[in-house]
């Protein structure tokens, strides 16, 4: 199974792949390690020169945008930027075309042209050259900005592949008994991705719900039904006792 991530409004992932997800990631075949990406193009190019107004983000409409990455630092002196990917599709960062840039304090991403990009091995980062960003000072101003593509550019996935955003909120049941375990609240990257599941507790409980990490592999999560929003698991003994939280 694969997770493909590109968080909606925030990213896409695949089941059994690596990568984190408020972004675009795909849930992939179990045991496969994922890299990130896929691309969107069009629109004019804004000049990314104004300083970042403040550190607060307003999340764009998740039905309209997929977050693919975050600019984390400048790279060199020629205006390149380093991007932490929220996408399992390398094309998002390596194929020229239009992307959308959201600055802190803004509410709508603005189009900007990707000229070229490359992957930094062993760092899980991409280095991008964006149009209009020609020196280190300009690239430093983009630190903390988020990159998006339109939700309409969401790629088709293969068998046993899932968008992380579709997994969030799905209910998890024990396959053998049908008992409700809880609901997926996050997908955490690892050699095989982990579903973070908030355990079901009576509504009268005043305690913070406990969570448990469940490997997102076919052997443990054999049923993932997007239509009914249901995941069935066959956890090994002791797995559900390893919850965290109070």
Swiss-Prot record:
The keyword rRNA processing applies. GO terms for cellular component: cytoplasm; ribosome. One of its GO terms (biological process) is ribosomal small subunit biogenesis. Residues 158-239 form the PRC barrel domain. Its main location: cytoplasm. It is found in: Cytoplasm. Residues 1-63 are annotated as: Disordered. Keywords: Chaperone, Cytoplasm, Ribosome biogenesis, rRNA processing. Residues 1-15 have a biased composition (Basic and acidic residues). The keyword Ribosomal protein does not apply. SUPFAM superfamilies: PRC-barrel domain, Translation proteins. Residues 45-54 have a biased composition (Pro residues). Transmembrane segments: none annotated. GO terms for molecular function: ribosome binding. InterPro entries: PRC_barrel-like_sf, PRC_RimM, RimM, RimM_N, RimM_N_sf, Transl_B-barrel_sf. Pfam families: PRC_RimM, RimM. It comes from the Bacteria. PANTHER family: RIBOSOME MATURATION FACTOR RIMM (PTHR33692:SF1). The PRC barrel domain binds ribosomal protein uS19. Belongs to the RimM family. Binds ribosomal protein uS19. An accessory protein needed during the final step in the assembly of 30S ribosomal subunit, possibly for assembly of the head region. Essential for efficient processing of 16S rRNA. May be needed both before and after RbfA during the maturation of 16S rRNA. It has affinity for free ribosomal 30S subunits but not for 70S ribosomes. This is Ribosome maturation factor RimM.
């Amino acid at each position: 199974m694969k997770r493909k991530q590109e968080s909606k409004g925030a990213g896409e992932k695949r089941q059994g792949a690596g990568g984190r997800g408020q972004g675009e990631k795909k849930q992939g075949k179990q045991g496969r390690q994922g890299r990130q990406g896929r691309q969107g193009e069009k629109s004019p190019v804004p000049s990314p020169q104004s300083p970042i107004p403040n550190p607060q983000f307003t999340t764009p409409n998740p039905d309209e945008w997929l977050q693919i990455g975050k600019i984390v630092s400048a790279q060199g002196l020629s205006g390149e930027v380093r991007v932490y990917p929220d996408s399992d599709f390398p094309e998002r960062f390596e194929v020229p075309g239009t992307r959308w840039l959201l600055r802190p304090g803004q509410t709508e991403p603005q189009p900007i042209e990707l000229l070229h990009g490359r992957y930094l091995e062993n760092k899980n980062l991409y280095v991008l050259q964006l149009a209009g960003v020609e020196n280190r000072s300009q690239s430093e101003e983009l630190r903390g900005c988020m990159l998006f593509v339109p939700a309409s550019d969401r790629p088709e996935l293969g068998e046993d592949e899932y968008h992380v955003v579709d997994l969030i909120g799905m209910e998890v049941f024990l396959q053998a008994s049908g008992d409700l375990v809880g609901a997926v609240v996050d997908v955490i990257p690892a050699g095989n991705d982990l579903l973070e599941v908030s355990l079901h507790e009576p509504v009268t409980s005043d305690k913070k719900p406990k969570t448990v990490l469940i490997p997102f592999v076919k052997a443990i999560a054999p049923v993932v039904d997007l239509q009914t929003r249901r995941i069935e698991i066959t956890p090994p003994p002791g797995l559900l006792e390893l919850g965290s939280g109070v």
